[in-house]
């Protein structure tokens, strides 16, 4: 079994970048499988719960094997609740919107992540350099917005789509920040991940009255596998968080890891463009801006944080 706190890549930027890119691939596969599950099943709560159960199995099993007590982590509880709400809403719209379109609409979550980082960790970010941190987040945000223009037909976007997109941008940005704080402060990784999964399930149960009462097993194998995959991704992500715990680079490097993990939209757009032959110059500009944001944050990590 992996010993998290003895992992050798201490404060290694290359390792953080590798983890971020790996997470983006995992997230892309997760979104693809969930969109299939919702299309085949149609009941977003059933699909959400199936995914959450798949997410729970691996960390819970590893936690029970270690026979350690549960550490009550309020960040983990808040993370589970936030992801429960966000994922339930996201899955509910997969039945009538292409997953690429949905992800393109909600890509600017990084700006919420950065703003929360600045608010919660304001004592750890040098005041005179806070604007630099925000600037790095804005570069990445612009990159993701440009990426959205590659796959969206704006004439088909409704006011309802915009409202839902804004809600998901805020809630996913908050959830991702809370997840990062959970990883950076965690005393027991499997306990924290298990707590997230349990509270995600509890939150999703609250959506049952909005789902109707039809039940079907159709497509649930895809959502369950998606849950298994994302649990592996979260365990891998905690390797990254643990490698920078108590480091002066923690804020910048965790932001870099999050920015890169959000690049699943890049993979979804490229995959989508292969079939519709619609890969515009926006996609290349967006990727370049994301790379620049990563470089800028890594460069400023030596001066802007303490």
Positions of PLM-derived features:
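C-terminal transmembrane-helix exit sites in multi-pass transporters
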Residues: 109-133, 263-285
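Helix-helix packing/entry segments at the starts of transmembrane helices
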Residues: 49, 88, 101-108, 183-199, ...
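Hydrophobic transmembrane alpha-helices of multi-pass small-molecule transport proteins
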Residues: 1, 128-151, 281-301
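Cytoplasmic-side transmembrane-helix entry/capping segments in multi-pass membrane proteins
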Residues: 17-20, 71-81, 127-140, 161, ...
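Glycine-/small-residue-enriched transmembrane alpha-helix faces in small-molecule transporters
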Residues: 1-46, 81, 85, 89, ...
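Specific transmembrane alpha-helical segments of multi-pass solute transporters/efflux pumps
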Residues: 26-29, 33, 69-101, 140-142, ...
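Hydrophobic alpha-helical transmembrane segments of multi-pass integral membrane proteins
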Residues: 15-22, 41-63, 135-142, 163, ...
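Hydrophobic/small/kink-forming positions within alpha-helical transmembrane segments
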Residues: 24, 28, 32, 80, ...
């Amino acid at each position: 079994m992996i010993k998290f706190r003895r992992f050798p890549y201490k404060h290694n930027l290359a390792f953080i970048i590798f983890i971020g890119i790996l997470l983006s691939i995992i997230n892309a596969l997760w979104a693809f499988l969930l969109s299939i599950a919702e299309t085949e099943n149609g009941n977003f709560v059933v699909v959400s719960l199936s995914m959450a159960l798949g997410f729970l199995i691996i960390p819970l099993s590893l936690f029970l094997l270690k026979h350690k007590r549960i550490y009550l982590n309020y960040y983990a509880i808040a993370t589970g609740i936030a992801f429960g709400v966000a994922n339930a809403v996201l899955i509910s719209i997969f039945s009538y919107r292409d997953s690429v379109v949905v992800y393109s609409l909600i890509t600017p979550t990084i700006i919420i992540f950065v703003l929360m980082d600045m608010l919660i960790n304001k004592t750890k970010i040098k005041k005179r350099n806070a604007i630099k941190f925000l600037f790095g987040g804005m570069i990445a945000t612009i990159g993701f917005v440009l990426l959205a223009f590659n796959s969206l037909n704006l004439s088909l976007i409704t006011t309802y789509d915009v409202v839902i997109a804004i809600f998901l941008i805020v809630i996913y940005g908050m959830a991702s920040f809370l997840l990062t704080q959970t990883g950076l402060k965690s005393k027991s990784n499997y306990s924290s991940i298990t707590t997230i999964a349990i509270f995600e399930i509890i939150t999703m149960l609250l959506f049952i009255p909005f789902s109707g009462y039809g039940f079907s097993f159709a497509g649930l194998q895809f959502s369950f596998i998606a849950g298994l995959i994302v649990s592996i991704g979260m365990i891998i992500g905690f390797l990254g968080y643990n490698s920078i715990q108590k480091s002066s680079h923690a804020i910048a490097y965790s932001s870099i890891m999050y920015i890169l993990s959000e690049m699943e939209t890049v993979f979804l757009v490229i995959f989508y463009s292969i079939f519709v032959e619609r890969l515009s110059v926006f996609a290349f500009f967006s990727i370049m801006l994301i790379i620049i944001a990563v470089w800028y944050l890594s460069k400023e990590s030596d001066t802007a944080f303490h």
